[in-house]
């Protein structure tokens, strides 16, 4: 799976919602009530077309998740950070079509895509990744271990927030 910008025509929010509507209705869920609330932010951001801060996790055939990614300065960091938040996942994950293991794999793939962005097109040495819930932290707990092979000089999970810093030598290799 790859994290890609949401763009017309095949990765537009409209196209993704169409796919997710079919997914929800395939298990008898009323999409109009299922999507109320959580989809509103994306509807607003895409009202006038593509929005540069929106990304989707795709396997080439389907979109599994979407999130907002921003590169910004924060006072507690000396350089720009990458912030990923407002994660929405396909109804197949929320309605039990996919199992917990598949959900975990998708969330890890999404985080991996954010790390890739931080080393490539949206260069940043610090990442703030807002999980869907504190329960998702279990999928990332092993990354808190301080090992020589780790990409991270710091990796913390507080509630539903992952904060991590890439090792400087890792950043230099991508420059």
Where would I find each of the regions flagged by the language model?
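Non-catalytic substrate-recognition and accessory regions of acyl/acetyltransferase enzymes
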Residues: 1-101, 116-128, 142-175
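Glycine-rich acyl-CoA binding loop
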Residues: 100-114
């Amino acid at each position: 799976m790859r994290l890609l910008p949401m763009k017309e025509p095949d990765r537009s929010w409209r196209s993704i919602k169409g796919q997710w509507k079919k997914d929800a209705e395939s298990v008898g869920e009323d999409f109009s009530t299922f999507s109320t609330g959580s989809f509103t932010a994306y509807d607003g951001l895409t009202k006038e077309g593509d929005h540069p801060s929106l990304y989707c996790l795709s396997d080439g055939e389907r979109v599994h998740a979407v999130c907002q990614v921003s590169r910004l300065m924060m006072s507690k960091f000396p350089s720009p950070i990458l912030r990923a938040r407002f994660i929405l996942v396909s109804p197949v994950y929320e309605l039990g079509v996919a199992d917990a293991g598949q959900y975990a794999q998708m969330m890890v793939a999404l985080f991996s895509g954010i790390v890739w962005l931080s080393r490539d097109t949206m260069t940043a040495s610090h990442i703030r990744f807002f999980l869907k819930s504190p329960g998702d932290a279990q999928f990332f707990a092993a990354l808190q271990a301080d090992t020589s092979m780790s990409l991270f000089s710091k990796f913390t999970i507080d509630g539903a927030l992952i904060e991590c810093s890439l090792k400087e030598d890792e950043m230099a290799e991508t420059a």
